[in-house]
Amino acid sequence: MNLSNFIKICHLLYDRKYVVGSGGNVSIKNKNLIYITPTGSILGFLNEEDICVADIEGNILKGKPTSELNMHLKIYQNKESINAIVHTHSMYCTAFSALDKKLELLTPEAEIFIKKIAYVDYFPCGSLELAENVSACVEDSIILKNHGIVTLGKDITEAYVKTEVLEEIAQLNYIMNNLGE
């Protein structure tokens, strides 16, 4: 399988500071296989050879996947139309989540790509509770309390664009909150 676009998206996430250090993780589904970033990896420096592979039941076929593997698996198992997941710790979305503030969809892009945001309470990273609560969301753009965001798509480009738009509206909400009355 050609993973060049997968790697390109990982690098974009890092270059645009939606992830820092070893934070965040990305996966794509191809039939019964999940291609996912490895644990402890820095997305900006990943190569195709680094990508881990698991089947839809969670059997690891290659590498040591991210600790959030269960979350990715549960989403794919519950949402057949989803083929890509992006999880970041983007700064503005995470700040709003820590303050329990909801975001307003302020732009046409947000109305088109995001439509509605789900909010999930805090659960420990990598926990089954986090996986179950995120996978139960109907929405494809999910803000995790004190933890970041998860965006879902039919492909990795769609999931990435949702990440980009969600972080932009968080920034706009911040600006408007500080310029407004």
From Swiss-Prot:
Pathway: Cofactor biosynthesis; coenzyme F420 biosynthesis
Enzyme class label: lyase
Binding site for Zn(2+): 68, 87, 89, 147
Cofactor: record remark: Binds 1 zinc ion per subunit.
Pfam families given in the database record: Aldolase_II
Keyword Cell division part of the UniProt annotation: no
Keywords for the protein's UniProt record, in alphabetical order: Lyase, Metal-binding, Zinc
Quaternary structure annotation from Swiss-Prot or TrEMBL: Homotetramer.
Protein name: L-fuculose phosphate aldolase
Organism for this UniProt entry: Methanococcus maripaludis (strain C5 / ATCC BAA-1333)
